[in-house]
UniProtKB/Swiss-Prot annotation:
Keyword tRNA processing annotated: yes
Gene: tgt
Quaternary data: Homodimer. Within each dimer, one monomer is responsible for RNA recognition and catalysis, while the other monomer binds to the replacement base PreQ1.
Sites where the protein binds substrate: 94-98, 148, 191, 218
Source organism (scientific name): Thermoanaerobacter pseudethanolicus (strain ATCC 33223 / 39E)
InterPro entries: ArchSynthase1/Queuine_TRR, TGT, TGT-like_sf, tRNA_ribo_trans-like
Function of the protein: Catalyzes the base-exchange of a guanine (G) residue with the queuine precursor 7-aminomethyl-7-deazaguanine (PreQ1) at position 34 (anticodon wobble position) in tRNAs with GU(N) anticodons (tRNA-Asp, -Asn, -His and -Tyr). Catalysis occurs through a double-displacement mechanism. The nucleophile active site attacks the C1' of nucleotide 34 to detach the guanine base from the RNA, forming a covalent enzyme-RNA intermediate. The proton acceptor active site deprotonates the incoming PreQ1, allowing a nucleophilic attack on the C1' of the ribose to form the product.
Name of the molecule in the record: Queuine tRNA-ribosyltransferase
Keywords attached to this entry: Glycosyltransferase, Metal-binding, Queuosine biosynthesis, Transferase, tRNA processing, Zinc
């Protein structure tokens, strides 16, 4: 028995957008889907009950951070990540590759794996593809990621080629080490920087290994948006239709719509929660910095068109006051709204695909939000 099952329900007639159902050991997910990020086994400031109320069906957690603190063995003793954090819906864990490679001066890469120093206390650690699988097996997530090297942008061709080869070797090793295939699905991660031939080669070689799903990694790391979209377009072309596709670390409203148009099913990003804590919210008419002075006497909701808990109950003036007073509730209310906005956006995208109106929906959304239709 496979851990997950993807069913393609409908394809958009004018784009590569797909409507699907992803069955996991912890529930059914309608795709395309946005996954809130709970790095430390918590989506910052939100309870699991609140996440359910806003419609989250799957969240993401982070292997690197949970390995360092509290430790995967402790989470395993607790009965796995779902029990530990009291979340009974699906969880996806990333491999920690992106975090380890972000450490730069604190890490050293070999073919065996990566030696790195903890950002918490400077202690030395060594991640191999097998170790990363062992950690994720202990966490018990529904969907796991292979260990990959995330090349920086820009990077020269030879470096990215070596990096891609390493990612493929590590994917093979990780797949061999994965013990719990009936309850946890392991995705391969397509790398290759912004080089089209490397992306194509990496995708084809990973597809030959027959993973239950595929991630597109190494994007949204500083490259221009049109380059990212071109690479996504090219990559999805080489991925099987009957498996889910996940674009890692992408979550602004325009990127979600553009990603779906190019055949992506799953997205995650810290953006909505991070900007919420800084007093910035998404609205149907674009971003709004609620802590700014003009909102001191604005008693309207964050977004007139939103029916989230925050917009039903609180005004811009009140939320601005909370931010100015450094009250914890400010971040909570803004986070609830931002996550609800993106989850609702995905719902509207799915409905647009159902009705074959995705391009019309994009046009209307972009115009109202203030995006230029460049792509």
């Amino acid at each position: 028995m496979a851990a997950i099952k993807y069913r393609l329900i409908k394809k958009d007639s004018r784009t590569n957008a797909r409507l699907g159902i992803l069955e996991t050991p912890h529930g059914i997910i309608e795709t395309p889907v946005f996954m809130p990020v709970g790095t430390q086994a918590t989506v910052k400031s939100m309870t699991p009950e609140e996440l359910k109320e806003i419609g989250a069906t799957i969240i993401l957690s982070n292997t690197y951070h949970l390995y360092l603190r509290p430790g995967h063995k402790i989470i395993e003793k607790a009965g796995g990540l779902h029990k530990f954090m009291n979340w009974d819906r699906a969880i996806l864990t990333d491999s920690g590759g992106f975090q380890v490679f972000s450490l730069n001066s604190l890490r050293k890469i070999t073919e065996d794996g990566v030696e790195f120093r903890s950002h918490i206390d400077g202690s030395r650690h060594f991640f191999t593809p097998e170790k990363v699988i062992e950690i994720q097996n202990a966490l018990g997530s529904d969907i796991m990621m292979s260990f990959d090297e995330c090349a920086p942008y820009p990077a020269d061709y030879d470096y990215v080629k070596k990096s891609m080869e390493l990612t493929i070797k590590w994917a093979e090793r990780g797949k061999r080490a994965h013990k719990n295939t009936e309850k946890q699905a392991l995705f391969g991660i397509v790398q290759g920087g912004t080089y089209e031939d490397l992306r194509k080669e990496c995708a084809q070689r990973l597809v030959d290994m027959d993973f239950p799903g595929y991630s597109i990694g190494g994007l949204s790391v500083g490259e221009p948006k049109n380059v990212m979209y071109d690479i996504v377009d090219l990559t999805t072309e080489y991925l099987p239709e009957d498996k889910p596709r996940y674009l890692m670390g992408v979550g602004s409203p325009d990127d979600l719509i553009e990603g779906v148009i190019r055949g992506v099913d799953m997205f995650d990003c810290v953006l909505p929660t991070r900007i919420a804590r800084n007093g910035t919210v998404f609205t149907s008419k674009g971003k709004l910095i609620v802590r700014d002075a003009p909102y001191a006497e604005d008693f309207s909701p964050l977004d007139e068109e939103c029916d989230c808990y925050t917009c039903r109950n609180y005004s811009r003036a009140y939320i601005r006051h909370l931010f100015k007073a450094n009250e914890i509730l400010a971040a909570r209310l803004a986070t609830i709204h931002n996550l609800y906005f993106l989850i609702k956006l995905m719902e509207r995208i799915r409905e647009a695909i159902r009705q074959d109106r995705l391009l019309e929906f994009k046009k209307q959304f972009f115009k109202k939000y203030g995006y230029k239709e460049e792509y």
